[in-house]
């Protein structure tokens, strides 16, 4: 049913055409996720236009890529920063980002001739400096970084399976169990890790999840960088993550918000890959 023009609000009016940003969804990418993002039913009130939902996603991808503050979102995003922030928070509560990652990851693997669900994965962590306004933090004594540590689990092609953010003073072996708990891919049966995941706690967490934990110990470097077997894949994923300015520092007041932006970065990456047909080689 159409809404009378006299009572239309910005939610019911189609967004004004604007110049496109590099982070914007293509028409093909939007058609791929539209049915997952746009609600099929409403609990009252007037339904929001599908074009408005696309604006919300574009706004979130823009913030993730450029690192701009919420209130600095360009005004030509007619959805507005407040509405975009509300949907960011809502998707954290409903788990929509995890669902999008799973669906897009399975499609990417299938198109590359692999099984939809991986059976092996690689784990790693990286420490990120936190801004003064950020929330929980700690000091990574080894890297001399005051901030947070993000622990990620990726498949053998580098696609994100799970992320867990902690204060930087939390050891990798202590966070491994929580990271596995956030992994929704039950088919993973083997995980490669570095020496920071040795000890009783990681072994018990892996055994509880039915996973074979393999510690990769590379040769002592004779000079220069030595690539460790298997583990170089997760290092490449860390490089992809750092292409997004919102993630090179911790700006968020909660650790869950940082996890949310990290998942958004990988959702945008998967959509671009599926558009271009470049499934595993490049951005």
State what each model feature region is.
Residues 1-283:
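Short alpha-helical elements
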């Amino acid at each position: 049913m159409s809404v009378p023009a006299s009572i239309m609000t910005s939610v019911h009016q189609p967004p004004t055409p604007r110049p496109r940003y590099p982070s914007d969804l293509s028409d093909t990418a939007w058609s791929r996720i539209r049915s997952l993002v746009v609600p099929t039913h409403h609990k009252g009130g007037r339904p929001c236009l599908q074009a408005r939902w696309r604006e919300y996603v574009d706004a979130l991808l823009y913030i993730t890529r450029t690192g701009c503050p919420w209130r600095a979102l360009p005004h030509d995003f007619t959805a507005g920063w407040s509405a975009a922030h509300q949907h960011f928070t809502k998707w954290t509560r409903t788990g929509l980002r995890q669902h999008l990652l799973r669906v897009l990851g399975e499609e990417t693997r299938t198109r590359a001739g692999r099984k939809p669900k991986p059976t092996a994965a690689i784990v790693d962590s990286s420490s990120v400096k936190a801004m003064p306004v950020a929330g929980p933090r700690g000091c990574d004594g080894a890297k001399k970084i005051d901030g947070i540590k993000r622990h990620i689990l990726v498949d053998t092609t580098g696609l994100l399976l799970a992320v867990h953010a902690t204060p930087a003073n939390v050891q990798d072996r202590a966070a491994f169990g929580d990271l596995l708990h956030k992994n929704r891919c039950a088919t993973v049966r083997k995980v490669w890790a570095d020496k920071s995941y040795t000890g009783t706690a990681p072994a018990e967490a892996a055994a509880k999840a039915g996973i074979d934990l393999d510690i990769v110990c590379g040769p002592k470097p004779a000079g220069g960088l030595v690539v460790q077997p298997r583990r170089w894949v997760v290092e490449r994923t860390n490089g992809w993550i750092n292409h997004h300015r919102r993630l090179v520092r911790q700006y968020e007041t909660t650790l869950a918000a940082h996890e949310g932006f990290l998942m958004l970065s990988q959702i945008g990456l998967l959509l671009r890959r599926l558009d271009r047909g470049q499934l595993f080689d490049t951005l």
